[in-house]
A protein has these predicted regions:
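S-adenosylmethionine/decaboxylated-SAM
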Residues: 1-153
């Protein structure tokens, strides 16, 4: 549901004594309302989250470069490659960019598949693996998580 990933991230920050702010971008107003309600019901102050209504491709370039510890991408898979470079630009050294649901039935996408989603997932995997600024890993949890830490450069 709306806000589930955000709740986990907020709980993780609170569990470590972090006072960070969760920034979430979504184009759907009802998802924002649901997330805000979920965060409030879980006991998080309104100032712990910043919900931005808009298309991520329009919003990401306006965010502070080098100002984020984590960029979590959970969007239409066909758009993942569009978010890659913008997401990396937002990371502090040591920060992590993570792409959700990158596996197909627990395995990398079949190279024979030529549909838009499969091609987009392969494209972002190649981009992450080939980027010298990053140290990538593929975690077979849930639908698969492609994560990469930004190196100190």
């Amino acid at each position: 549901g709306a806000g589930v990933s955000g709740l986990y991230l907020l709980r993780g920050m609170a569990g470590r004594g972090e006072d960070g702010v969760l920034t979430s971008i979504d184009i759907e107003p009802e998802f924002h309302r649901a997330a805000r309600t979920a965060f409030s019901e879980a006991g998080f102050q309104a100032g712990r989250s910043r919900l931005i209504l808009g298309r991520a491709v329009d919003v990401l370039p306006r965010l502070t470069a080098g100002g984020y510890d984590l960029v979590f991408v959970d969007a239409a898979k066909a758009e993942y490659a569009h978010y890659f470079e913008q997401g990396v630009q937002l990371l502090r050294p040591g920060g992590v960019i993570a792409f959700n649901d990158v596996l197909s039935k627990g395995k990398p996408v079949d190279p024979v598949r030529r549909d838009t989603e499969a091609m987009a997932l392969r494209e972002v995997a190649r981009a992450v693996a080939g980027d010298e600024r990053l140290m990538p890993t593929l975690l077979p949890v849930g639908g698969g998580l492609l994560a990469a830490a930004r190196l100190e450069v």
